[in-house]
């Protein structure tokens, strides 16, 4: 795909004026970094960062049977989500393979917003549309209806509070409420993908530039800086958060990924993948699959996705994500490994980096957890 064919967000000119390095991400021309990705990472951990996430896929589901449709289409119990709250869940194939991981916001009694990963938005839209047959509910593609800005980091509550009258103190994690930010109508959600406190702001695209400028101005004294997708990846890696295409795929069920807790068998009615996921749960209980673990380098060489994890001359797993960790000061990775080598502190584990078996320490995820 040539750069002329890439989709651009409402903030594209802003990113270019800031000197951003742009990259093709799931068909979108997105900012990878503005300067030093390490500085952007540290800003989010210690102060605040501002992200353009307008490539994410918003899908609205409305109607008298919206909850019933989502309970059938997704593996979670969406009917128990109260208005103003959100839930992390997944959509699976009939064979249990993960199509995507999602956040579902209940906006009103009979209105939900499903937020899919950019790379899977069309797949999720098609699946929900197909699964809506027979339900009194409408599935609407709202990807062009929203721009999405995220303010993440310990200073984000104070920065946002200076621009809104919304009750941020009462806004819990995984909750969202309509409000006005810098005069702009927004859905204000206390969600994020960095391991820090923060907010995601869904607004009309025509309001994105003004809101970005207002947030930049309000955050200047607190040290807020614009941040690209590169540091977003290292932030989520430190926080032990899975990325679709790395830790999650159609080849894995939620139980294979260690995320069986998102599957709610107790909910009323059937749901797509129930039979296969029941078998997957039984398999995982009797013969645990490979386990997702953290790996911390003893040296300086950085592992990458697809590198083999080894022990005793045998391949025992595969790296799914790897990068230098600005917080730990050493390379880190997430990897699926055999259960026998998954316990934190397991000795003799290494990563095959271009023929050299580099020693790595097995640790529990996440690598980083913020102090609340």
Curated annotation (Swiss-Prot):
Pfam families from the UniProt entry: GCV_T (PF01571), GCV_T_C (PF08669)
Gene Ontology CC terms, in alphabetical order: cytosol; glycine cleavage complex
Protein's UniProt keywords contain Transferase: yes
Enzyme Commission code: 2.1.2.10
Keywords on record: Aminotransferase, Transferase
Disulfide bond positions: none
Keyword Transferase: yes
Catalytic activity: N(6)-[(R)-S(8)-aminomethyldihydrolipoyl]-L-lysyl-[protein] + (6S)-5,6,7,8-tetrahydrofolate = N(6)-[(R)-dihydrolipoyl]-L-lysyl-[protein] + (6R)-5,10-methylene-5,6,7,8-tetrahydrofolate + NH4(+)
UniProt-listed NCBIfam families: gcvT, PRK00389.1
Its biological purpose: The glycine cleavage system catalyzes the degradation of glycine.
Family statement: Belongs to the GcvT family.
Descriptive protein name: Aminomethyltransferase
